[in-house]
Amino acid sequence: MAQYSLFTSESVSEGHPDKMADQISDAILDAILADDKNARVAVETMVKTGMAIVAGEVRTSTYIDLEDLIRDVILDIGYNSSDVGFDGASCAVLNAIGKQSADIAMGVDEANNKDLGAGDQGLMFGYATNETDVLMPAPIYYSHRLVEKQAELRKNGKLNWLRPDAKSQVTLRYDNGKPVAVDAVVLSTQHNPDVSQATIREAVMEEIIKTTLPAEWLHADTKYHINPTGQFIIGGPVGDCGLTGRKIIVDTYGGMARHGGGAFSGKDPSKVDRSAAYAGRYVAKNIVAAGLASRCEIQVSYAIGVAEPTSISVNTFGTGSIADSEISKLVAQHFDLRPRGIIEMLDLLRPIYRKTAAYGHFGREEPEFTWEKTDKVAALQG
């Protein structure tokens, strides 16, 4: 990986339409897993003016009141009135969920001592870097924190003119591979019509940007773009159609690591798009936490119905304290990257996924996020 002098990442709030869709899909997954941990779930959501549509494939023994669940998620995010353009209590809810293909189930399920096969073919990446305490790239980490702060101030009423939809973008200046300054910040937030742009700019600067970004990184030449197009009253699903899985770079490393292309939300852990990406993060984070490298990227790949990965690759970009080939041996020794091994290693058959669906799947040391633990450090250090 080349050394950047500038690097930019973005994030979006829980009220962004694509993130609404992700949260609905993961809320459905959670509700099913809470009662049927062996369910197969692949649920996609679309939200647009006045409606939420869910579709996909599910195999489960439980029953979920999807309409009430979907409405509750929308209302919880903050779309609770026609005044903000979308109301979870009155929007149409359309359900086009069907059964999982028997052909897929036959190839994936465990039976007659056959191990759980990967739910699909594909390639996944995990990444960690020591440029932040949580071993995440700084641009995406701080982009998440900005929109998370926007939501906090909206929900606690401190800035009661804020509305749910918001986006952030952070450009950091790097010196010798380490972030040293903020070059530019973009924050666009939906708002009520009766607040002035001057009030918005001052509040966003003082209450969001300055309380979130490290003061020592802000300087006289930092560029601030706060609602740069002017008013942002029309937002959420009225302003843009939202779809599950359309923020895969926001969900991961903000572009600083590669991405295999598979989205996460709405997928149960038999889908390696999700579970193997979580495992990749777990492996890479433990390697960096153990001091074996200052940056580490893991690639894994799978064939549908086959348990063993078709490949496992390690790249430390020349930062490793030992050879990448030696780190690869340690990975094989200490991490089981078969689908069943990942599920058991990270305890993934739990209703923990809606929480992942906004503000990043990685770099948040929540108790449910087992892939953020660094409990393999001692074993890796030998």
From Swiss-Prot:
Principal subcellular localisation of the protein: cytoplasm
Binding-site residues for L-methionine, renumbered to this chain: 57, 100, 240, 271
Binding positions for ATP per the UniProt entry: 16, 165-167, 240, 246-247, 263, 267
Necessary cofactors: Mg(2+); K(+)
Pathway involvement of the protein, from the record: Amino-acid biosynthesis; S-adenosyl-L-methionine biosynthesis; S-adenosyl-L-methionine from L-methionine: step 1/1
UniProt region (Flexible loop), positions on chain: 100-110
Domain of life where this protein originates: Bacteria
Gene Ontology cellular-component terms listed: cytoplasm
Pfam families assigned: S-AdoMet_synt_C, S-AdoMet_synt_M, S-AdoMet_synt_N
UniProt keyword list: ATP-binding, Cytoplasm, Magnesium, Metal-binding, Nucleotide-binding, One-carbon metabolism, Potassium, Transferase
The UniProt record lists the keyword rRNA processing: no
Entry EC no(s): 2.5.1.6
GO MF entries: ATP binding; magnesium ion binding; methionine adenosyltransferase activity
Gene3D superfamilies in UniProt: 3.30.300.10
Location in the cell: Cytoplasm
Binding site for Mg(2+): 18
Cofactor: how and how many bound: Binds 2 divalent ions per subunit. Binds 1 potassium ion per subunit.
Binding site for K(+): 44
Catalytic activity reported: L-methionine + ATP + H2O = S-adenosyl-L-methionine + phosphate + diphosphate
Role description: Catalyzes the formation of S-adenosylmethionine (AdoMet) from methionine and ATP. The overall synthetic reaction is composed of two sequential steps, AdoMet formation and the subsequent tripolyphosphate hydrolysis which occurs prior to release of AdoMet from the enzyme.
Family: Belongs to the AdoMet synthase family.
Complexes and interactors: Homotetramer; dimer of dimers.
Entry-linked PANTHER family: S-ADENOSYLMETHIONINE SYNTHETASE
Protein name in the entry: S-adenosylmethionine synthase
Naturally occurring in which organism (per UniProt): Saccharophagus degradans (strain 2-40 / ATCC 43961 / DSM 17024)
Upper lineage: Bacteria, Pseudomonadati, Pseudomonadota, Gammaproteobacteria, Cellvibrionales
